[in-house]
């Protein structure tokens, strides 16, 4: 796969040249492709840096204009990523072929899943962590011919805590005292009418360019609160960051290019989502009651809006 896609120019995401809060009004800087270029530079000089091991080095954007450099970094990132994906695809093919040869394909559940999504140049980012769609949406493909119709795509809100009870139900095992909910009915085309309408998200690690936050997402809207407190995380450094909110209308702004938190037309929606977010935090037991600094911060930046 080393030379796969050599000479290919991949399409760019529409917001590749998003340069930060000044571009879309978001609350944080994020982890831009320029940071990845810095790591490539370190690895080019010292290949034994374990956290900087990348293919196709040396690579440099020195001497390039800023826009040209970012585009060059994106092309390298996506080319490496696609090569990796092709290798994974080959091996999945071998697995499925073996199941067919063994005669057990129709009675075997095959799941392809990741622990999160990944930025591939969207917003000028690489990596994950932040609650934009590219990072928050997890790849999940499941194959079970005798139970699940092929070629279908669900729009239901599914969480990774739902995986275990789902597989257990397929196996005839009843699970008790788990946070997740089986989505076997959803996969069979019979989504329960009371299926969840919102999901809760939290990112604990606190950093100057990717502050700690929690959030709520419905089928249309997303609300994020960046509280930027270290709490139990002791190695994240000290920095100045004013707690703030981001809000996105995923129907009118699917690529999350404009933070609409201060748009007055969304004020009723935002107020309602803050209430729903509070309820979700209570539901999962994530209320920060043991952190006095968080209670003070929430009173100042959150609770006053609920009155």
Identify the role of each PLM range:
Residues 116-122, 161-164, 169-246, 250, ...:
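C-terminal cap/loop subdomain of S1 sulfatases and analogous C-terminal strand-loop tails that border
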Residues 263-266, 289-295:
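Mature extracytoplasmic/periplasmic domains
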Residues 1-158, 169-178, 232-245, 256, ...:
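Active-site-proximal cap/lid insertion segments
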Residues 54, 287-290:
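Signal for well-folded cores of large energy- and translation-related assemblies
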Residues 273-277:
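Short amphipathic alpha-helical coiled-coil/interface segments
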């Amino acid at each position: 796969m080393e030379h796969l896609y050599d000479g290919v120019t991949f399409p760019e995401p529409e917001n590749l040249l998003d340069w930060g809060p000044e571009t879309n009004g978001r609350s944080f800087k994020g982890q831009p492709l320029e940071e990845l270029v810095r790591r490539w530079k370190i690895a080019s000089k010292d290949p034994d840096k374990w956290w900087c091991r990348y293919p196709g080095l040396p690579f440099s954007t020195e001497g390039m204009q800023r826009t040209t450099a970012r585009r060059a970094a994106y092309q390298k990132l996506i080319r490496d990523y696609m090569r990796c994906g092709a290798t994974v695809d080959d091996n999945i093919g071998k697995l499925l072929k073996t199941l067919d040869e063994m005669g057990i394909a129709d009675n075997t559940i095959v799941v392809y899943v990741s622990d999160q999504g990944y930025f591939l140049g969207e917003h000028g980012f690489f990596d994950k962590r932040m609650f934009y769609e590219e990072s928050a949406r997890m790849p999940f493909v499941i194959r079970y011919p005798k139970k699940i119709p092929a070629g279908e795509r669900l729009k239901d809100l599914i969480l990774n805590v739902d995986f275990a009870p789902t597989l257990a139900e397929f196996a005839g095992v009843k699970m008790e005292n788990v946070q997740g909910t089986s989505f076997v009915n959803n996969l069979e085309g019979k989504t329960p009418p009371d299926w969840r309408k919102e999901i809760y998200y939290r990112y604990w690690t606190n950093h100057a360019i990717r502050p700690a936050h929690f959030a709520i997402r419905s089928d249309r809207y997303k609300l994020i609160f960046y509280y930027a407190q270290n709490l139990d995380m002791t190695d994240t450094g000290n920095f100045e960051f004013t707690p703030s909110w981001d809000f996105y209308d995923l129907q009118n702004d699917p690529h999350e290019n404009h933070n609409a938190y201060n748009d007055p037309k969304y004020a009723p929606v935002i107020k309602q989502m803050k209430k729903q977010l509070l309820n979700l935090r209570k539901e999962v037991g994530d209320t920060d009651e043991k952190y006095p600094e968080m209670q003070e911060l929430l009173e100042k930046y959150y609770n006053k809006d609920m009155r």
